[in-house]
Amino acid sequence: MAGIIGGNLTKTGILGIIAGYPNEAMETLLDQYEKDVRQLAADRKLPNATVLRAYANSWEDEELGKEIANQMIGKGADVLFIYANKVGNGCIEAAKENGVKVIGFSENQNDLAPGTVAASIKFDFGKIYSWILEHYMDGKLNGNEVYGVGIEEEIFIPIFTDEVPKEVQQTVENNMK
C-alpha cells in the first residue's frame, strides 16, 4: 500500500525510509516497500530510483528524526515513509519545512501536518490481537516464526488525504483485494 502511494507521489525517484529500531517484521515490511517504490518509479521512467533507509535506534528522539529527514531531503528525497513513533514527528516537521510528502505508518498521522502527510497506513492492533489469539487457540502458531499477516486480514488500513490522487487510491484499494 505505502509503496504504491510513494512510488506514484515521487517526482525525483528518490524516497526515504525512516524507522525506529530494526526487527525482522519491520525489515520485511520495509524491504517490500522499497521493492514496490523502485518498481513504480522505474515504470514511471524516473531514472535511478533510489531508496534511502535509516534507523534512528529510538522511538522517542524527535530531533534525531528531523535530522535524519533533513539529510535525506538534502539528497533529493521528496517522499518519506515513516515507521518511527515519536521520531516520526521530527521527520514530519522537516518534511513540512521543505515541501516533502510523508506517508505515516501505524497510526493515522494525516492531521499532524495537512498538506505534508499524504497518507497513513494504520495498523489495527485489535485485529492483530484477535488474529493471534484465534490462531494460538487453534494451535496454528509456532514459536520463533514470522507470519505474513496484514492486508488480507484487514490489519493495515490506508487513510488517504487529497494529496493522493484518486486513481492512486483506487490502485491501492484494488491491490488489497
Predicted regions: what is each one?
Residues 1-177:
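A residue-level marker of the well-folded mature domains of exported/periplasmic proteins
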